[in-house]
Design a protein with these regions (language model features):
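Transmembrane alpha-helices and adjacent helix-loop boundaries
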Residues: 1-231
Length: 231
């Protein structure tokens, strides 16, 4: 009979849930950073910056996420060790799976956030920017007073979608032995031979994260539009 504590493994799923949320939040922060840099690059007047941003988004969106995770976790340390060996140094490099997971997921979804921010920047009315220039606003002041407040408002729906996909993608880092929700469910399923029970429980946890995220996103969007609605 399935008990409420999931045969003694309920604590493991809750711990895995906490780790999944931590990885998701860290990766989202990194994705926003990469996204802002990528959007700046795509909209830059410098050809090199545009080329780097285009290359980044094309490569990341063209390579399967699982391959990128394995490449970062297993490939990067091996590459560093080989380079050190060729220079005559005996070096051992081990990546922390938690750090590797955040870095890789953040890098991947930064490419998608790049397009979100690019569209948000372009959605800011040009007339307002030209009016700010006519009033003698400097670039920094115009960015802070005119562009960024509106850009974030336009970007919020897209960033919410990025978060929804990102948090589910954290399940992929179970392949690098990080005991997040998916890995914890797999361990419990193998130990008890009850795969349906634990994978179904994990799916409910993911669904719960999604529902809570949708509620929070809706409230943030409503708050961000208060000024526009009053205007």
């Amino acid at each position: 009979m399935v008990t409420l504590d999931l045969h003694g493994y309920g604590w493991m799923l809750w711990r895995g849930l906490g780790l999944t949320i931590l990885v998701g939040l860290g990766a989202m922060a990194l994705a926003v950073t990469f996204g802002l840099l990528g959007a700046w690059g795509k909209l830059s007047r410098y050809r090199a910056a545009r080329w780097l941003a285009d290359t980044y988004t094309t490569v990341i969106r063209g390579v399967p996420e699982l391959i990128l995770i394995l490449l970062v976790y297993y490939g990067v340390p091996t590459l560093i060790q080989d380079l050190a060996a060729s220079a005559g140094h005996d070096l051992r490099v081990d990546l922390n799976p938690f750090v590797a997971g955040i870095a890789t997921i953040g890098l991947i979804y930064g490419a998608f956030a790049t397009e979100v921010f690019r569209g948000a920047f372009q959605a800011v009315p040009r007339g307002q920017i030209e009016a700010a220039r006519a009033f003698g606003m400097g670039r920094a002041l115009m960015l802070r007073r005119i562009v960024l407040p509106q850009m974030w408002r336009f970007a919020l729906p897209g960033l919410g979608n990025v978060w929804m996909v990102l948090i589910k993608a954290t399940a992929l880092i179970s392949v690098i032995q990080l005991e997040e929700l998916m890995r914890s469910a797999d361990i419990a399923a193998r130990a008890t031979r009850l795969p349906f029970t634990f994978f179904f429980a994990a799916s409910l946890f993911y669904l719960g994260i999604t529902i809570v995220s949708m509620v929070i996103q809706g409230r943030i969007e409503s708050w961000s539009y208060r000024g526009a609605q009053r205007g």
